[in-house]
Amino acid sequence: MTNTSNRSAKFLLLFLSLLSLHAAWGQEEGDSSWQLKGFVDTYHAVRSEKPNDFMSSRTRVRGEIGKSFGSSTLFVSFNTTHNALLKGRTGFELREAYLDHREEHWGFRLGRQLVIWGVADGVRIIDLVSPMDMTEFLAQDYDDIRMPVNALRFFVFNEKMKLELLAVPTFEGYKLPTDAENPWSVLPKNTALHLVWNEDGSSPKLHFSNIEYGGRLCFTLPGVDFSLAALHTWNKMPMITYRSSGNHMTVSPQYYRMGFFGGDISKPLGQFVLRGEAAFNVDKHFSYKPEAGAMEQKGFNTVNYLVGVDWYAPYEWMVMAQFSSESILRYENQIAQPRHQSLLTLNVSKKLLDSTLQLSNFTYFDLNHEGWFSRFTSSYALNDHIQLSVGYDWFGGNEGIFGRYKNNSEIWAKAKYNF
């Protein structure tokens, strides 16, 4: 039996086992505090331009297991994935595994978990704790892009206030696509020298001095929610360095300490919700232009902010617009990013057929380079368990982060079964 057949058999066996456990636990739901749920999804994308090759082809089983005992909850979630295009992504992945305990006015959560800060939608201003999986760039669900971290979180709260203290002992950075077979690779193509990705020794070591730490103070008041936050962290998106050696060039990621303090605010006004978010980044590092050569890296302070408005319109329409901008203080010409970098997002959706069909579009528009990424989606709920989706990812522009992928526009289809 081939390796592919072995993986397929294990995949099917795991799925059938989860269904059996789900059925057995469902029969004892009244007597048991165990909970099992999850989903199976399959996603396939084809480039809309020649050579019309596959951009993605993966099938996944997500399992989520919870156990409640008194004021505590144990939660574990995992993925088992078969990726036909990126063989290295095939296998088992522990997603979350944490212990959560809550008392009347305090609590804690210890373990591998997702940490979500701020009110921005698909844009990172103060949401800098959890890194991002950019293996397929932004052409996947944002919930799959955000990565969990090993964190210790302590909470103190009442009806109007919540204080969160956070420590992340182990470093995890962005997961970047560096495989030449990956159409979303961040490495340049058609280079004179062969590129070799080497991240050995790049990540911060497991030392007490390298711990990330911070806190967030949230207020829920009549007519307005807002928070203040601060974090001593690392740049999760690494700076890329190139060093030539003989007949090849070594490409390595570099990580540097940085920090921020900022906050967010959200205020409902009838059918509208106004949102804002801002951060002052300290010692943030940036990639340099190629002509900068081996110039020594240094940190810069930046001001990053976002304003947004959501309209929950009649007849199940929803429109969400955001404008964000980052300004680098004491700018120097070797920095590859513009002094003022701005991004506009627009999210429009409409539900039809008794809310079983949803048509939506989410667009990022790079105002500096006039590039864009627009995801059109049509999603139909066949029943309470099965959802079918088709869509088109449209990239455009000649420069910037979206222009890099202007030939990666794709047609995609997805099926999802929830259990």
Task: Show the residue positions of the predicted features.
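Transmembrane beta-strands of outer-membrane beta-barrel pores
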Residues: 42-48, 69-71, 80-84, 103-105, ...
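Membrane-embedded beta-strand positions of outer-membrane beta-barrel proteins
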Residues: 38-40, 76, 110, 154, ...
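Residues that define the transmembrane beta-barrel architecture of outer-membrane proteins
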Residues: 53-59, 90-95, 104, 146-150, ...
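Outer membrane beta-barrel
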Residues: 66-184, 218, 222, 397
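Detector for outer-membrane/organellar transmembrane beta-barrel domains
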Residues: 266-364
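Transmembrane beta-strand segments of Gram-negative outer membrane beta-barrel proteins
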Residues: 28-48, 72, 76, 359
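Outer-membrane beta-barrel "beta-signal"
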Residues: 348, 407-419
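Repeated loop/turn-to-beta-strand initiation elements of outer-membrane beta-barrel proteins
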Residues: 34, 71-76, 106-108, 160-163, ...
